[in-house]
């Protein structure tokens, strides 16, 4: 069993929804021994036929930030997701409070990724943070975060109870840290702007030394060199 949970905050009272998420997490742990892989915290936002002023339960930014902090404290092992529904300012604040997964360069309309520019009249919701992926990656690194494109656990079948055991023992760091740096390296080599690549190379050189397991660290350094030479798809 491997699940993600979440609600759209603002449809009903946020206290009910917040407690509901935590009770759901508690039930999953008790019944299955496996909590949520991720918790998503979107909030009601403008769209073609939606005005947030019509929703009396819409959540102000300061309350939204408290919701993120409470969930992070209560479920320290889960990945917490925020989308481009939220503004750059809000996303920056909640990254400091517990968000670990964000989107960048998102399109919410049908077929939105097929053309560089297209009519967004079919968009599911309005995007508040309209920066490109490169701009988001650059921004994250300037704040000291490691942008990771890793999907190694899913690809290796490291989900459910296998994933939880790594998380709760803290050993996941010996997978996540090098995988994050290697996938960032791939992005820098293949897609990044010159400025983003320069910042990223400096970040990788600093962070690779922090991988706790010596054998993993040495192998990751070797893989990073091979990525520079054009090889791809290394993972722990």
What residues fall within each predicted segment?
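Glycine-rich tight-turn/loop motif centered on a GG-T
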Residues: 51-60, 120-126
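Short amphipathic alpha-helical interaction segments
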Residues: 59, 82, 86, 124-128, ...
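Radical SAM enzyme core and accessory elements
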Residues: 92, 97-100, 106-236
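Conserved C-terminal portion of the radical SAM core fold
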Residues: 1-50, 60-89, 96, 101, ...
């Amino acid at each position: 069993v491997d699940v993600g949970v979440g609600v759209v905050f603002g449809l009903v009272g946020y206290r009910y929804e917040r407690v509901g998420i935590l009770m759901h997490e508690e039930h999953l742990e008790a019944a299955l021994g496996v909590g949520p892989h991720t918790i998503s915290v979107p909030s009601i936002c403008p769209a073609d036929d939606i005005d947030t002023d019509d929703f009396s339960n819409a959540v102000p930014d300061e309350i939204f930030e408290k919701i993120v902090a409470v969930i992070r404290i209560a479920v320290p092992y889960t990945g917490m997701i925020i989308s481009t529904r939220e503004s750059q300012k809000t996303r920056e604040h909640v990254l400091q409070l517990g968000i670990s997964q964000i989107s960048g360069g998102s399109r919410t309309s049908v077929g939105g990724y097929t053309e560089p520019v297209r009519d967004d009249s079919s968009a599911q919701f309005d995007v508040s943070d309209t920066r490109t992926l490169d701009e988001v990656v650059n921004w994250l690194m300037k704040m000291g975060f490691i942008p990771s494109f890793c999907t190694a656990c899913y690809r290796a079948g490291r989900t459910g109870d296998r994933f939880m055991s790594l998380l709760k023992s803290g050993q996941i760091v010996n997978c996540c840290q090098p995988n994050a740096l290697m996938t960032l390296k791939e992005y820098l080599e293949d897609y990044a702007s010159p400025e983003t690549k320069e910042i990223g190379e400096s970040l990788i050189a600093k962070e690779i030394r922090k991988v706790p397991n010596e054998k993993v660290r040495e192998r990751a350094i070797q893989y990073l060199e091979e990525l520079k030479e054009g090889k791809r798809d290394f993972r722990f």
